[in-house]
C-alpha cells in the first residue's frame, strides 16, 4: 500500500461542476487533475471509463441538491482514488477482497490521506483551477488546539466522513 498521498481531486464543488462540459473536456479547466487522470490511464486503461461513468453518475444526481452531490462526490471520488493509487486497478476490475480492503481503508485511512482540516479542492492560481496541495479525501475531526499537538507527536487523528 502506498504511504504518500499521490492523487489529485477529480470533481469540483457543485456550483462549478454543473457548469462544466461532460466527458474528458471537463478536465481542461483543471490541469493538475487532467495530468493525473492521463498518467493513471497509462497504467490503468479502464480508468478513463471509471472517470466518465462516475462523472455521468454525479451529473445525474447534481440536479437534486448540492448536499446530495457533495455526499456522492466524496464517496465515489475516494473509491476512484483508492482503486487507482492503492489497488492499482480500475473500479471495473475490483473484486470482493478489494472492496473489503477499501472498506477497511475508509475506516482507518493512511495518515497521508487525512488532512488536518477541511480544505477546498482547488485554488485559482494564475487564472487556472489548480490542486490545493492541502486537500485530502478525509479530514481530521479533533479540537483545533489539540490538532497540532497530536500531529507533532506523531499520533493518528480521528477522521471525518463528512463532506468537504
Q: How would you label these PLM feature ranges?
A:
Residues 1-77, 81, 90, 101-104, ...:
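Basic/aromatic DNA-contact patch characteristic of tyrosine site-specific recombinases
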Residues 53-67, 77-164:
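N-terminal core-binding DNA-recognition domain of tyrosine recombinases/integrases
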Amino acid at each position: 500500500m502506498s504511504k504518500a498521498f499521490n492523487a489529485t481531486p477529480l470533481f469540483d464543488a457543485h456550483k462549478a461542476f454543473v457548469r462544466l462540459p461532460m466527458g474528458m473536456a471537463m478536465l481542461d479547466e483543471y490541469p493538475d487533475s487532467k495530468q493525473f487522470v492521463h498518467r493513471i490511464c497509462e497504467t490503468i486503461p479502464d480508468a478513463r471509463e471509471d472517470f466518465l461513468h462516475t462523472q455521468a453518475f454525479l451529473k445525474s444526481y447534481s440536479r437534486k441538491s448540492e448536499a446530495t452531490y457533495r455526499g456522492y462526490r466524496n464517496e465515489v471520488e475516494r473509491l476512484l482514488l483508492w482503486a487507482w493509487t492503492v489497488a492499482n486497478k480500475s473500479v471495473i476490475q475490483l473484486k470482493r477482497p478489494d472492496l473489503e480492503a477499501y472498506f477497511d481503508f475508509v475506516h482507518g485511512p493512511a495518515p497521508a490521506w487525512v488532512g488536518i482540516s477541511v480544505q477546498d479542492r482547488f485554488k485559482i492560481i494564475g487564472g487556472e483551477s489548480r490542486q490545493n496541495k492541502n486537500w485530502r479525501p478525509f479530514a481530521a475531526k479533533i479540537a483545533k488546539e489539540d490538532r497540532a499537538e497530536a500531529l507533532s507527536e506523531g499520533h493518528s487523528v480521528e477522521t471525518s466522513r463528512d463532506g468537504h
